[in-house]
Each structure stands twice: as C-alpha cells, then as structure tokens.
Design a protein with these regions (language model features):
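Conserved residues in the N-terminal Rossmann fold of short-chain dehydrogenase/reductase
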Residues: 59-60, 113
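C-terminal helical subdomain
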Residues: 178, 185-188, 197-235
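The beta1-alpha1 cofactor-binding region of Rossmann-like NAD(H)/NADP(H)-dependent oxidoreductases
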Residues: 40-41, 60-74
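Conserved glycine-rich Rossmann-like NAD(P)H-binding loop of the short-chain dehydrogenase/reductase
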Residues: 29-45
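Canonical Rossmann dinucleotide-binding motif of NAD(H)/NADP(H)-dependent dehydrogenases/reductases
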Residues: 2-34
C-alpha cells in the first residue's frame, strides 16, 4: 500500500516569533511546512533550525510584493500541485505611539499593504491549490486589537487593519463554505516576541498553539470564527 502523502502547509512571516513556532508545531505533526520569509537567507536559516522538527522547506515570499507571491505560487504549484493549509501570519505594527489624528498616512498604507492586502493576495493566489486539497484550511493571524467590541485607544493602523482582516475572514468563510475550506481568524494573545516585547505574558508556544489548532480542525470544524486558544472572541 502506498503511503499517504503528507499535507502541505505554508506559513508567512515564518523566520521568527509566532510564525517560526507554528512551523515547528506543524512539522512535528507530519506536515510538509513551507517556511517563508521576504529575505531568502532568513527563510533558509529558519528552515535549517527547524529541520529536526520534520519536513520543512524555505520559500522566498514577500507578502507586500505581488510578483513575489506569484513566483512562490508557481514554485509550489510545480512541486506539490496543491496546498492544504495557508497561515497568513506576516504582519507589521509600526504605529504604536501614534493616534488616528496624527498617524503618518504613508505608514498606514504600508500597514494596509502588509496586514490586509498581503493575506488577501495570498488567498487569491493560493485558492486554486487549496481547492485541490481534501481538507483545506486558511488561518488569518489577527489580534484582539481588531475586535470592535474591545477596540479603544491603540495603534491605529494596526488595529484597523486587523479589524479589516477579520472582515475578510468572514467574507471568505462565507464564499468558501460549500468548497469545504475552513477560514478562521486567530488571536495568539500578547506573546513575548520581537513585536510583543519581552514583558508579554504568553510564550511563543502558547500563542502558536491556537493557530495550529485552527490549521488542523476536522472536516466538520468551525469556520468564519475569531478565536483565541480555541475559544470564540467577539468581532
């Protein structure tokens, strides 16, 4: 009997922090994990560090560059023919000390390009490959900062783009429900990463676990939701 092929997962922003740990956890579960970064050397370094966890492969991918997305999609389509899991993890937060009133619009546009249009373009590019999977999953790494129920004063471009990412999640989940592709947003919580800072209360392992949970939901699993640690959050 031939061995069932391993499921293929792509993780953006995977060279450090939550993305790196998501790759480690997925690889340890038997996935072939495509470790992406916008710097090819960093993707290769991350893949080397993850080699003991399982099957990993570095892929050059800049979510803010449409040509980079196209090249990565072509490479993956040629080598694997499908994609089972897409984790949109890459994101930026450059406006921590700004307000909506005085925000630099150039920085806002950069944040929109990475945090919203990046995942949107990735979904558009990889949906043909995800449709070939028997159990495809899309996980958008969001933040409670993007919850309208909890939103207040905070980094304006970051939280507005995360709210928009949540809206994209709901839209895609509705469109893809009958295609058996589950689409969810996950808040990893305040995690001790380069972005979250050393004083954050949650470990990278804890933050990544909720993302991996959504990436490995069963066929009849939830879709169109916003979760932390597998529990619903308000939009």
């Amino acid at each position: 009997m031939s061995k069932e092929p391993s499921s293929v997962a792509l993780v953006t922003g995977a060279n450090r922090g939550i993305g790196f740990e998501v790759c480690r956890q997925l690889a340890s579960r038997g996935f072939v994990v495509l470790v992406t970064a916008r710097d090819e050397a960093k993707a290769k370094t991350a893949a080397r560090k993850l080699a003991n966890a399982g099957a990993v492969e570095p892929v050059l991918l800049d979510v803010a560059d449409p040509s980079s997305i196209k090249n990565a999609q072509s490479e993956i389509a040629t080598k694997y023919g499908l994609l089972d899991v897409l984790v949109n993890n890459a994101g930026i937060n450059y406006d921590t000390w700004e307000t909506a009133e005085n925000a630099d619009i150039g920085g806002v546009m950069e944040t929109i390009t990475t945090n919203l249009l990046g995942p949107w373009r990735l979904c558009q590019a990889f949906l043909p490959l995800l449709r070939k999977s028997k159990a495809a999953r899309i996980v958008n790494v969001s933040s409670e900062s993007g919850s309208l129920a909890h939103m207040g004063v905070g980094p304006p471009a970051y939280q507005v783009t995360k709210a928009a990412l949540n809206a994209l999640t709901r839209t895609l989940a509705g469109e893809l429900r009958h295609a058996h592709i589950l689409v969810n947003a996950v808040c990893p919580g305040w995690v001790a990463t380069d972005m979250g800072g050393a004083g954050a209360p949650r470990s990278v392992e804890e933050g990544a676990a909720g993302v991996v949970w959504a990436a490995t939901l069963p066929q009849n699993g939830l879709t169109g939701g916003f979760f932390r640690d597998g529990k619903p959050l308000p939009w």
